[in-house]
């Protein structure tokens, strides 16, 4: 529904990953892809991008009539007072999905279903209710989780992890990130009512890779572009710029990384020359 209304941003690049997801979904059994990657590399974006591709009919015939549903565990758990309430709701959701032809269930942060809804000491949690359906291939499920959670929580549940096909989602390179930013450029320009230069997009990708080390591309580069636009929105109309350039991006990176603005774009060669 969100994809058909145009709420989802376009997916740029990630051809191999999307191809592999489609390949796993087309299997007869154990047709459940699991996207594993660091926070911010775009795992959810791949699932959303697949939904958008299905709506735009850019997928193969086998997936053409599919519909991607996102599971909100919080909504399922909210207000379950007594034992069995959660299981009843979850069973209802699964039964509904089984009847719908071409339904694909997307569970973001899939490690949360292990232990979800289990009463103290009880073994019946969401993952155990899901297991029988996953093996038979009656429900196709896309999951996403980080390496840390995959190793620490998900992989320990052998019966569940073997029903999924692990797909590693690596961090894109700076060049790929520039391509992603170019693809999203029009969305941010429309929201902030200004323009971004190509040099500003390149600077956002390069400087975020160099100076913001606790997060991953393309997420941190997208944040910089978004924040550069937001900064201009906060300025009085007389000072507001219509075009965001490299200087504005450097100023935002300096603020986010807490470094002096001068040293943001200084190259390593220049620094080494003065040693």
Locations of regions flagged by a protein language model:
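AAA+ P-loop NTPase nucleotide-binding core of proteostasis motors
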Residues: 1-275
